[in-house]
Structures are given as structure tokens and as C-alpha cells.
Amino acid sequence: MGYLQLMGFGPDGWGSDMLRATGMTVAVASSAFTIGLVFGCLGATASFSKSLALQAAASSYTTALRGIPDLLVIYLFYFGSSSLISGVGSLFGSDGFVSAPAFLTGALAIGLVSAAYQTQVLRGAVLALNKGEIEAGRAYGMGYFLLFRRIILPQAARHALPGVGNVWQLVLKESALISVIGLVELMRQAQVGSGSTRQPFSFYLTAAALYLLITFISGQAFRLAEARSMRGLRRGV
């Protein structure tokens, strides 16, 4: 079977399966990235807290999650949550092992790992703020929320976008690791197809091309966002 027929949309083609798997990859990566952004904001906020306990918690979190291999984190979340569900089920008379939802546990595991990196990105963005503009806003009589919305947030977002874009690329690549817990995303579908047809190169080449396509499109989106955030700023001569 030729490559075009193999990856076609006919009865013997795998094109539809690969496209569905690509959609699943985008969905799980987007979910994990969003989870990471939320927890990253919390981590960055904790790192600037006056409470030494919160500062220590944020530092310990980022150190631990960046130090443990991502695959191990996925296994811990998947089997840990499955054991918890099975234990709860046994209390109500259910016997046997109950698997946790692969999408949910995978997205949560990757999201919390990415949060460790996003915490550092967001913390660096806040440290790069123009303190003079913040002091001027306070002198003008701005309240905290107005100051945050008009001065702090736009500047922090501008500084954070490049780093956040890099974290997105990391999350996209890490989404392939979720294949080990059975979620049929792009990498898993390539494994299934290559095993069924004994043409692994064709499937892995197609998967690589689709990953690159997602990377290119998302990279363009982040570049447009960066360009938009820079509008109205004077460039140094």
C-alpha cells in the first residue's frame, strides 16, 4: 500500500484516525497548558507573598516538579488516582482495579509540571516591570485593581509572552507521553497504525509532520500576540 493510500480517507486509509488523534493532542495540550497557567499564576503570587511559608511552598513546588521526570509524574498521577478510585469503590462493594480517566489525569499531570515552569516565567515578568510607572500610578491615586488592570497586567503579559510561548511548545511535546496510559492521541495513534500495517516509518513521519504543523500555527499565534502587545511602544534608536 502506497503512502497516499495509507494516509488517505478511504476505507483502508488512516487519515481520519490521524486527524482525530491530532485533535485529541491539541485538546489535551490546551487543557494542560491552561491548568499550568492557572497554577503558575498562583505559584508566582505565592513567591511574592510576605509569608515565608508561601514562599517556601512555591520554591519547593517548582524545584520538585522540575526535578522529577515528566513520565514518572504521569505514572504517579494515573496509578495514584486509579488506586484511590478503586479504594473508594471497594467501600461500596466494587471489586477490581478501576482506571482513572486518561485524559483528565494526563492533562492534570502535564499541567502541574508546566505550572512549575510558568511560575518562573511569570515571576520573571513581574520582576521586569517598570517600577516608575507603578509608583506614578499610585501617586495619581489609582487603586490596586485599576493599577493592576491598566499598568501591571499589560506590562507583565508583554514580558511573559515569549516564555509562555516556550512553555506551550514544551507542553505540546510532553503530551505525547500520555500515550503510555492509553489515551489515543497522535503518538498513540501512530503506534497503533504502525503495529497494524507494519509501516512504522510512514506513521511516525506523518505524526512528526502534524506536530510541526501544530507548532508552526501556534508559534505564529504567539508571535502575533507579542507584536500586538508591543504596539504603541517607542523603539530605541
Curated annotation (Swiss-Prot):
TM region(s), chain numbering: 24-44, 72-92, 96-116, 201-221
Chief subcellular location: membrane
Protein name, UniProt field: Octopine transport system permease protein OccQ
SUPFAM superfamilies to which the protein is assigned, alphabetical: MetI-like
Location in or out of the cell: Cell inner membrane
Keywords tagged on the record: Cell inner membrane, Cell membrane, Membrane, Transmembrane, Transmembrane helix, Transport
Lineage: Bacteria, Pseudomonadati, Pseudomonadota, Alphaproteobacteria, Hyphomicrobiales
Protein's organism: Rhizobium meliloti (Ensifer meliloti)
Domain ABC transmembrane type-1 residues, every copy: 22-222
NCBIfam families: HEQRo_perm_3TM
Protein's gene: occQ
Highest taxon, organism lineage: Bacteria
Family as reported in the entry's similarity comment: Belongs to the binding-protein-dependent transport system permease family. HisMQ subfamily.
Transmembrane in keyword set: yes
Membrane-related topology note: Multi-pass membrane protein
Pfam families: BPD_transp_1
